[in-house]
């Protein structure tokens, strides 16, 4: 989980909320898009970490280092 992506999600939420509050539809949509992009990046990072962990586990099993 990336702290940077969590911060970007929060920034997007704030931007979306401000846009909604002041009636700026463009700002609202930009904020919503930033939130989604950051969430996708976070999920991709988590998946990458999981795959790397699984690969490392398989390597250890094959080399006998899993003990």
UniProtKB/Swiss-Prot annotation:
Gene3D superfamilies membership: YjbJ (1.10.1470.10)
Residue segments, region Disordered: 1-30
Domain of life: Bacteria
InterPro entries, A to Z: CsbD (IPR008462), UPF0337_stress_rsp (IPR050423), YjbJ_sf (IPR036629)
PANTHER family referenced in this protein's UniProt entry, alphabetically: UPF0337 PROTEIN YJBJ
Family under the similarity heading: Belongs to the UPF0337 (CsbD) family.
Protein's recorded name: UPF0337 protein spr1626
Taxonomic lineage from the root: Bacteria, Bacillati, Bacillota, Bacilli, Lactobacillales
């Amino acid at each position: 989980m990336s702290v940077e992506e969590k911060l970007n999600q929060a920034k997007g939420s704030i931007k979306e909320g401000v846009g909604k509050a002041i009636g700026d539809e463009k700002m609202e949509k930009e904020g919503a898009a930033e939130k989604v992009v950051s969430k996708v990046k976070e999920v991709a990072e988590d998946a990458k970490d999981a795959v790397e962990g699984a690969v490392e586990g398989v390597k250890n099993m094959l080399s006998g280092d899993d003990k």
